[in-house]
């Protein structure tokens, strides 16, 4: 009986680990933020980062998944 319970517990833990790993691999869609996971954009997209400034002071970096052939320029 103890062996059966232990085996069931091990299988549950392994299943949870596999589900979590699968969720981490999920790709980030177009125009969604990829600052913390720059390599997870869906196929055909790239993670493009920008340094944000407010009144001349750098306020951090933000990254977004955009098309690989898309380029943004300042106005």
Curated annotation (Swiss-Prot):
GO terms for molecular function: toxin activity. Expressed by the venom gland. Keywords: Disulfide bond, Secreted, Signal, Toxin. One of its GO terms (cellular component) is extracellular region. Its main location: secreted. The keyword Disulfide bond applies. Residues 1-21 form the signal peptide. Pfam families: Toxin_35. InterPro entries: Spider_toxin_CSTX_knottin (IPR019553). It is found in: Secreted. Belongs to the neurotoxin 19 (CSTX) family. 06 (U6-Lctx) subfamily. Residues 22-25 form a propeptide. This is U6-lycotoxin-Ls1h. Contains 4 disulfide bonds.
């Amino acid at each position: 009986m103890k062996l059966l319970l232990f085996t069931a517990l091990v299988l549950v833990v392994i299943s949870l680990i596999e589900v979590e790993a699968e969720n981490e691999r999920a790709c980030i869609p177009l125009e969604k933020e990829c600052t913390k996971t720059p390599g997870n954009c869906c196929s055909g997209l790239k993670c493009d980062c920008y340094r944000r400034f407010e009144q001349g002071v750098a306020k951090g970096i933000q990254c977004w998944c955009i098309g690989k052939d898309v380029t943004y320029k300042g106005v």
